[in-house]
Amino acid sequence: MTQALKDLGEYIAQALPQDVLGTEVNRCGELSLTVKAASIVKVMTYLKDDAGCLFKQLVDVCGVDWPGREQRFDVVYHLLSMKHNQRVRVKVATDEETAVPSVTGVFSSAGWFEREVWDMYGVLFSDHPDLRRILTDYGFEGHPLRKDFPLTGYVEMRYDDETKRVVYEPVKLTQDFRSFDFLSPWEGPGMLPGDEKAN
């Protein structure tokens, strides 16, 4: 299956050489394409309509926050081809001010997914028919899945029995959180705590 995905990645990259920046089959056997943000509609249309691809189902659109990068956000599209029994992941990099073209014209289901990415990360989508919050309250400040968003949020919302309505109050904590450097390396297969002292 891995070779078939590598061949598919090469097939797509050869068909769209100006739009596809890179292809990769990861160790889990998943094909990822990195494409130019301006080309996302063209690439998604090709993946949906080309006889060698036929990725007719948009499974999900999600965001990833990389605060250390200049283009801080990745928008990640997950597609499924029932005809060829294959999946592909399409990644686009963007920053806080640059809008990614909406793919709602190609996959209508992208409407809610893109709204969720905007609500959680603040990634803008141009030509979206209804870009507004979908998971948080209308008066919510900020985007809660960004790594620099405070764990406690900014306000606390609760129902007040006396006034018979929802009220917003500043967050009150009995103990402050410790400072956390979210750019520090984490324990993982390539780095263990204390490795930096070994050299």
UniProtKB/Swiss-Prot annotation:
- Subcellular location per the Swiss-Prot or TrEMBL entry: Cell inner membrane
Q: Which family does it belong to?
A: Belongs to the complex I 30 kDa subunit family.
Species annotation: Paramagnetospirillum magneticum (strain ATCC 700264 / AMB-1)
Q: How does it assemble?
A: NDH-1 is composed of 14 different subunits. Subunits NuoB, C, D, E, F, and G constitute the peripheral sector of the complex.
Kindly list the GO CC terms recorded for this protein: plasma membrane
Biological role stated in the UniProt entry:
NDH-1 shuttles electrons from NADH, via FMN and iron-sulfur (Fe-S) centers, to quinones in the respiratory chain. The immediate electron acceptor for the enzyme in this species is believed to be ubiquinone. Couples the redox reaction to proton translocation (for every two electrons transferred, four hydrogen ions are translocated across the cytoplasmic membrane), and thus conserves the redox energy in a proton gradient.
Q: Which gene encodes it?
A: nuoC
Protein name, please? NADH-quinone oxidoreductase subunit C
Its Enzyme Commission number? 7.1.1.-
This protein's UniProt keywords: Cell inner membrane, Cell membrane, Membrane, NAD, Quinone, Translocase, Transport, Ubiquinone
Query: Kind of enzyme, top EC level?
Result: translocase
